Amino acid sequence: MNENLFTSFSAPTILGQPATIPIIMFPTLLIPTSKHLINNQLTTVQQNLIKLTLKQMMAPHNAKGQSWSLMLMSLITFITMTNLLGLLPHSFTPTTQLSMNLAMAIPLWAGTIITGLRFKTKNFLAHMLPQGTPTPLIPMLVMIETISLLIQPMALAVRLTANITAGHLLMHLIGNTMLTLSTINLSTTLLTSVLLMLLTILEIAVALIQAYVFTLLVNLYLHNNT
């Protein structure tokens, strides 16, 4: 059976209609919405992780930056759930789509830039020119700093897309190899299945780390502008 290696990254359809939006919104269904208090170990662990992450992210911020706490926690929760759901068999991972990652990165990056221009205009403009720069180099350095600023959202989106896509491609290749070897050599198939299991564990870690890195970089941009 010959299958395009990138078929699993194509946006799925249901009855001829794109199913991307329902899939993207699905992680929100996993968040409990009961008005009653739910006391169990899973909820306690979840709350402790949220408090720890929130404490680490909001520690260097002033009151203006801390107003973004709900946004950042929602972001890391959404990306984490989306990445993990994409590891399920025959599922679709929205974070492998550069368009979706850009749709998250550009508004968040623009929000931090607007915040900096509004509340700390002088400090924001001062970042465009390092102190002590020789006069002949000023135009070139301003241009370089401007370009580096403008490519920040692209770097955010490409980093997340590349890491998630690379892991899924490896799992796809090793899975196909295991199916092919199952009719040839049983011992080699077992070794390949162990390798696939280890790679799956690694991909779970990558899914968590990439969600944290994406949110942490947005948090860093916010810290530089508040």
From Swiss-Prot:
It comes from the Eukaryota. It catalyses: H(+)(in) = H(+)(out). Its main location: mitochondrion. The chain crosses the membrane at residues 11-31, 68-88, 97-117, 138-158, 164-184, 194-214. GO terms for cellular component: mitochondrial inner membrane; proton-transporting ATP synthase complex. Signal peptide: none annotated. CDD domains: ATP-synt_Fo_a_6. One of its GO terms (biological process) is proton motive force-driven ATP synthesis. Component of the ATP synthase complex composed at least of ATP5F1A/subunit alpha, ATP5F1B/subunit beta, ATP5MC1/subunit c (homooctomer), MT-ATP6/subunit a, MT-ATP8/subunit 8, ATP5ME/subunit e, ATP5MF/subunit f, ATP5MG/subunit g, ATP5MK/subunit k, ATP5MJ/subunit j, ATP5F1C/subunit gamma, ATP5F1D/subunit delta, ATP5F1E/subunit epsilon, ATP5PF/subunit F6, ATP5PB/subunit b, ATP5PD/subunit d, ATP5PO/subunit OSCP. This is ATP synthase F(0) complex subunit a. It comes from Papio hamadryas.
